[in-house]
């Protein structure tokens, strides 16, 4: 509650990650690890719901739009997936760098963007959600929490977060979480200095490269889409949450993929490039899946790039801007805490500053 970060670090579930992964639907598991005060959790969820009144209708997407000036530094966080150790490690670094105060206040120039999938796949989803919303509550104009496909009520029953909520034995918490998730924006259209960036969890919709929608115009709110009501259901409500990219040389357009999780679209290189050109977008930054896009880590290896960044200085190569522009899409790293039984799992993120992309 007072942002004492060390107190939030609990390592038991990380050490038992493999055993837990096969048992995430059992509410009894979560009772062993819950450290939240339910009333504090409900108060924070209520604050978010009250601050965001409208829920999007069918065939609409909910967008945030923002302009960041030359002094802004953006910290863009990929999939946390209940990884409280990773999240606290990230916040601890911000604190140590003087970006985050012990009172939870971010520096005047700092902005934090969560790309979705905060919950599921581990036992600390509620704690991760609580910490992220605490950061938002203390910095409402500086923190953006986007909706991933795992911020979807139907997914919670499949990947563990539903059982975690059941462990509270409080239906009000479950309903507040549902209402909060329904109010999370699916995409952030941001102008960083004079350059346009798209931040989302999944991928651009299949119609986006030919869309008349002026994505970057106007303020926050809804915009109509041409995606059908069943396009991404039941897995997610929007293609911004669920679509993927295929950036191999022979993937030039888009394809439809039907599976157990519903229907989604895979966007190829030509459609991606056309979208970026049409809407004057420098780069798309997303999470969701490992594709053959430029994937950002302290040490990253892809088929196209190998980026070695010193873990001592956390500096990326001086020509990194060129790599960013050469990439079709940037994919942030994904934390799977239940697969990595480590107490020091790092949470990788993109840092965009007035000196370029670092």
What are the roles of these predicted feature ranges?
Residues 1-358:
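Feature recognizes metal-dependent phosphohydrolase scaffolds
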């Amino acid at each position: 509650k007072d942002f004492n970060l060390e107190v939030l670090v609990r390592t038991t579930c990380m050490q038992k990650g493999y055993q837990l992964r096969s048992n995430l639907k059992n509410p009894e598991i979560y009772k062993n690890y819950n450290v939240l005060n339910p009333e504090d959790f409900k108060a924070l969820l209520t604050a978010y719901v009250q601050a965001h009144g409208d829920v999007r209708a069918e065939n609409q997407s909910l967008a945030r739009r923002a302009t960041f000036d030359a002094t802004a530094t953006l910290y863009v966080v990929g999939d946390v997936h209940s990884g409280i150790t990773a999240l606290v490690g990230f916040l601890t670094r911000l604190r140590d760098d003087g970006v985050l105060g012990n009172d939870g206040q971010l520096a005047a120039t700092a902005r934090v963007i969560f790309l979705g999938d905060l919950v599921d796949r581990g036992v600390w989803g509620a704690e991760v959600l609580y910490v992220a919303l605490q950061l938002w509550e203390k910095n409402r104009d500086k923190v953006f929490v986007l909706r991933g496909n795992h911020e979807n009520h139907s997914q919670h029953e499949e990947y563990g977060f539903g059982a975690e909520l059941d462990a509270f034995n409080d239906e009000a918490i479950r309903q507040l979480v549902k209402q909060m998730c329904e109010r999370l924006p699916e995409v952030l259209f941001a102008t960083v200095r004079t350059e346009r960036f798209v931040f989302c969890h999944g991928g651009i919709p299949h119609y986006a490269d030919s869309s008349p929608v002026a994505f970057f115009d106007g303020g926050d709110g809804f915009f109509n889409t041409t995606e059908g009501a069943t396009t991404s259901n039941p897995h997610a409500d929007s293609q911004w949450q669920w679509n993927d990219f295929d950036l191999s040389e022979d993937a030039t357009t888009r394809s439809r993929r039907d599976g157990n999780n519903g229907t989604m679209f895979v966007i190829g290189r030509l459609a991606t490039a056309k979208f970026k050109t049409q809407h004057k977008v420098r780069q798309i930054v997303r999470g969701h899946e490992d594709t053959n896009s430029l994937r950002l880590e302290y040490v990253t290896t892809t088929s196209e790039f190998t980026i070695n960044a010193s873990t001592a200085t956390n500096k990326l190569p001086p020509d990194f801007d060129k790599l960013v522009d050469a990439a079709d899409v940037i994919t942030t790293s994904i934390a799977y805490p239940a697969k990595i039984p480590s107490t020091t799992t790092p949470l990788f993120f993109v840092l965009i500053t007035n000196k370029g992309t670092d």
